[in-house]
Curated annotation (Swiss-Prot):
This is GDP-fucose protein O-fucosyltransferase 4. Coiled coil: none annotated. Its EC number is 2.4.1.221. Protein O-fucosyltransferase that specifically catalyzes O-fucosylation of serine or threonine residues in EMI domains of target proteins. Attaches fucose through an O-glycosidic linkage. O-fucosylation of EMI domain-containing proteins may be required for facilitating protein folding and secretion. Residues 22-483 are lumenal. It catalyses: L-threonyl-[protein] + GDP-beta-L-fucose = 3-O-(alpha-L-fucosyl)-L-threonyl-[protein] + GDP + H(+); L-seryl-[protein] + GDP-beta-L-fucose = 3-O-(alpha-L-fucosyl)-L-seryl-[protein] + GDP + H(+). The gene is fut11.
Length: 483
């Protein structure tokens, strides 16, 4: 048992095949009252073509959704899911945490808190992470010691087990939609006084520090800024309730489509993190000026469909390029060629949209929450079957192989200033005081939680004590035994 706990350091599910799993056999680990109703959970109407699972509910493995704010079923807190190859019971009832049939706990990344983690972590349980949102929501997951706590992942990174990279792109047709406003009309609005560039943002203090970049860019080119951030122009009264730029209200979309260029600046910088800020301008037939994912070029329709901030050495150089493009209709229209199907030449994009098993507003496919849930269900049934076979005949059947996430499943870099080196940022700057500190404090919490798990602690409130102990060891020049 001690060996199993120690190996959580590098193989958090190394004890899949060990006798420690029998911890769940004693009565204290079987809160039967919580399971009484679960045995009679409703049966889903869909069963995958490869699913011939004959087991009744009382024999199925249980998946526990840990977040109190997220359970992708309605109504109730328990459901039977019949997936592509196998079936599970899924629940949000935390009373089953220590039950021996609870095979995996699914966490929603934004809500995951080290000081609320389900401890002790049982050797027979896996942890699954679903995190489709910004890296800024939980930097604990961007550190290697944090992401290694999970066995299955669904994130915006293509390297995750269940990638959500194109979650903000509903379909190929979304890109191919006709240009909302013709170039001739856009030029008319330019002559009427609109700036060439639109900035629509009301979430100001973010890790990417985009406002600092926009402030510098404004020195060299005219930008109409309608949101709360760097506002220099009021929205029409009929659009005031859409000032956060998250709405696809028809009138709002028509208004912003007048602009030839849209500043598309993500709130966090991380490979493969791309949101509606990129895809919406392209849907409308506007040219995005993009800063966010460092790998965005891997997913664009072709090599001439967006202006990438990182391709320019200075904001002034970028401004000069935009000004020239604003005056050249032929060159500008080259950026919209992807509106013709044959001009979408990026096979990775085409294959990514075609092969993803989940859909966006597509009734023929599951949403990505239920899709990931079934992914975990099938993987857990595979693991449990392999463990059973190994126990029955160890010589003939290999034990299930431990699986652990790594930094490529999420890892995002330390936030950096939107413009200029960090040394040029004033010490009392709100961005400097917030986001770099949050990034490193999240590392402290990740190391603290890993220490709690490794020491088989059952009380998450002891997190701060473990963090302090790690800090003291580091200050004394001792190695950190959590790594």
């Amino acid at each position: 048992m001690a060996l199993c706990l120690w190996l959580f350091l590098v193989l958090p599910i190394c004890c899949w095949c060990q006798g420690a799993v029998d911890l769940g056999d004693s009565g204290v680990f079987q809160p039967q009252s919580a399971l009484t109703d679960m045995e009679f959970a409703s049966v889903s109407t869909y069963r995958g073509p490869g699913n011939t699972d004959p087991r009744p509910n009382k024999e199925l493995p249980i998946l526990l959704w840990w977040s109190s704010n997220l359970f992708p079923h309605f109504p109730g807190d328990t459901e039977r899911v019949d997936c592509a190859h196998s079936s599970c019971l899924v629940t949000s009832n935390r009373k089953v945490q220590l039950y021996r049939r609870t095979a995996s706990i699914i966490f929603y990344g934004t809500d995951f808190r080290a000081y609320e983690a389900p401890l002790p972590r049982l050797p027979h349980q896996t942890w699954a992470l679903f995190h489709e949102e910004s890296p800024m929501n939980n930097y604990l997951l961007s550190h290697s010691v944090g992401i290694r706590l999970f066995n299955y992942t669904a994130t915006f990174r293509r390297e995750s087990d269940y990638p959500l990279t194109l979650q903000w792109l509903p379909s190929l047709d979304y890109l191919l939609a006709p240009t909302a406003i013709s170039l001739q009309e856009k030029n008319h609005w330019r002559q009427a006084g609109l700036a060439p560039v639109l900035y629509m943002q009301s979430h100001c203090d973010v890790p990417s520090d985009r406002d600092r970049f926009v402030q510098e860019l404004m020195k060299y080119i005219e930008i109409d800024s309608y949101g709360k951030c760097l506002n220099n122009k009021p929205l029409p009264e009929y659009l005031e309730d859409t000032s956060t730029a998250t709405s696809e209200d028809r009138r709002f979309m028509s208004f912003v489509a007048r602009y030839k260029f849209h500043l598309a600046l993500e709130n966090g910088l991380c490979p493969d993190y791309m949101t509606e800020k990129l895809w919406r301008p392209m849907h409308q037939g506007c040219v995005p000026i993009y800063r966010g994912s460092t790998t965005v070029a891997d997913w664009l329709p072709n090599n001439h469909s967006a202006i990438l901030v990182e391709d320019f050495s200075t904001p002034r150089e970028l401004a000069d390029f935009i000004k020239a493009l604003d005056q050249d209709d032929v060159e500008y229209l080259r950026y919209l060629k992807y509106k013709t199907p044959s001009e979408i030449t990026n096979l990775r994009l085409l294959e990514g949209l075609e092969s993803r098993e989940w859909g966006v507003n597509d009734m023929s496919k599951p949403n990505y929450l239920n899709g990931f849930e079934c992914f975990v269900c099938d993987k857990e049934n595979e693991r449990l079957a392999a463990r059973k076979a190994h126990r029955k005949n160890p010589k003939q059947n290999q034990p299930p192989q431990p699986k652990m996430a790594n930094s490529s499943h999420m890892g995002c870099p330390l936030p950096s200033p939107g413009y200029g080196p960090v040394e040029n940022v004033e010490p009392n700057d709100s961005w400097l005081q917030m986001w770099p500190q949050d990034y490193w404090q999240s590392l402290d919490q990740a190391e603290g939680l890993e220490s709690l798990i490794r020491h088989n602690v059952s009380e998450p409130s002891l997190l701060w004590q473990h963090i302090q102990s790690i800090a003291v060891r580091r200050a004394r020049g001792l190695s950190n035994d959590s790594r």
